[in-house]
Structure formats: structure tokens, C-alpha cells
């Protein structure tokens, strides 16, 4: 369902977002 797709997107996005946030901290 839609939630499954959202979950997959989140799991793919988080690993890319975390390092970017860490660089700015």
C-alpha cells in the first residue's frame, strides 16, 4: 500500500540525509 511505499522511500532517504545534517552540525 501507500504506507509501504512511504516506508521504503524514508528508508532510502534517511541514509543520505543524515550525513548532510551531520556535516552542518
Swiss-Prot record:
Which UniProt key words apply to this protein? Answer: Amidation, Amphibian defense peptide, Antibiotic, Antimicrobial, Secreted
Localization recorded for this chain is: Secreted
Keyword Secreted included in the entry's annotation: yes
The biological processes this protein is annotated with in GO are: defense response to bacterium
Leucine amide PTM positions read 25
- Known Pfam families for this protein? Caerin_1 (PF07440)
Regarding tissue, the record states: Expressed by the skin parotoid and/or rostral glands.
Instruction: Fetch the InterPro entries from UniProt.
Output: Caerin_1
Example GO CC term: the record gives: extracellular region
What does the UniProt entry state concerning the protein's domains? Contains two amphipathic alpha helix regions separated by a region of less-defined helicity and greater flexibility.
Function (record text)? Antibacterial peptide, that adopts an alpha helical conformation which can disrupt bacterial membranes. Each caerin displays a different antimicrobial specificity.
**What protein family does this chain belong to?**
Belongs to the frog skin active peptide (FSAP) family. Caerin subfamily.
UniProt name for this protein:
Caerin-1.5
Organism of origin is Ranoidea caerulea (Green tree frog)
The organism's lineage?
Eukaryota, Metazoa, Chordata, Craniata, Vertebrata
